[in-house]
Amino acid sequence: MKEIVVFNGSPRMDGNTVTILDLVAQGARDNRAKVSFYTLFKMKFMACQSCFACRMQEDCVINDELREALQKVKTADAVVIGSPIYMMQMTGPVKNLYDRFFPLMDVDGRPRFGAKKVLTVYSQSIDDVHTYDSYYEYTAAMYPSFGFEWAGNIVCPNANDPESADRDAELKIRAYEAGKALALGTAGA
């Protein structure tokens, strides 16, 4: 059974990002994956303190609500990270999450816990899904150090409409199929 960890980086509990993440999670669950779902805006967690304690051990020493999720990421087969685009970037809690992934790499910048797929989900107000491609690629440049193999993006355009994702049948199918592919180990193949 594949284990998948999903992070929702949207403050809206019923918005486009969550709609897509829920479909990815459902596609994975329907194909026998175990899915752990975390909503960052509901969690109390600190940003990385750059204390470098994780260089001496394999864990972050900060004992907060993110700790359990980070432990699951270490053994997961796949990670899904979703965020709306605010001010041309991911939300602050998602950036803090990426910083807290620092213990996933060793002192030489190599992954400590093996390879796993990562799927990213974004919602944006702009209608061109390629507007932020360079930002997505820039963000993905850090993935190899974490042991993440980028399985691609799912982007919901026109997200100022809170029901954009729900009305886009093609996007919904793509999200469900992405979850299925993560569960079956065929994502990004």
Where are these regions (language model features)?
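Helix-loop-strand module that forms the ligand-binding subsite of alpha/beta enzymes
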Residues: 61-144
